[in-house]
């Protein structure tokens, strides 16, 4: 079990992010609840052993995030059957320069859509992080937190790869000042397809 662990505020999006993404996948069913559009950003410093997507570690990988792509994301998200947007990577919270404007726009123009994000940070670490990360967190509905730990791998977990990771209701957690687990947690009853990406 190895990974990198930052000191609070050590990793700064404005210093690391190159404004790039690995992929954008519209209309999928595996990255959260319902039909979702998933944005995979480039760059991650955690480097979890057994990571399913090592290709996302480099901040220079992939393609530039563009205004044209953002318009496509918004158009896809506007479809009535799409429940929301999912932010993955790479590490979304090290790409706040891209994601904060996008998420703010979604909140303004498509406020009925939900936003999920995965992160290598734990909730407790996030509470000690930089203002940009905390602002992005405040705009998200559901957070899957924590590093992937291959010694705790479990394919029966819903939307997670290892049992140390949690599915957190962000708004309830922020309001209550402590972690509140997503009330639709359904471990062991989801298909392999929903967890295989971990």
Feature locations, PLM:
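N-terminal [4Fe-4S]-dependent radical SAM core
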Residues: 1-40, 53-59, 179, 186, ...
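Conserved Radical SAM active-site core
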Residues: 12, 16-22, 35, 53-117, ...
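Residues at the C-termini of beta-strands that transition into short coil/loop
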Residues: 25, 119, 147, 171
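Cysteine-centered iron-sulfur cluster-binding motifs in ferredoxin-type domains/subunits
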Residues: 36-51, 91
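P-loop/Walker A phosphate-binding loop and immediately adjacent motor/lid segment at beta-alpha junctions
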Residues: 95-110, 153-198
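Short Gly/Pro-enriched loop/turn and capping motifs at secondary-structure junctions
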Residues: 122-124, 148-152
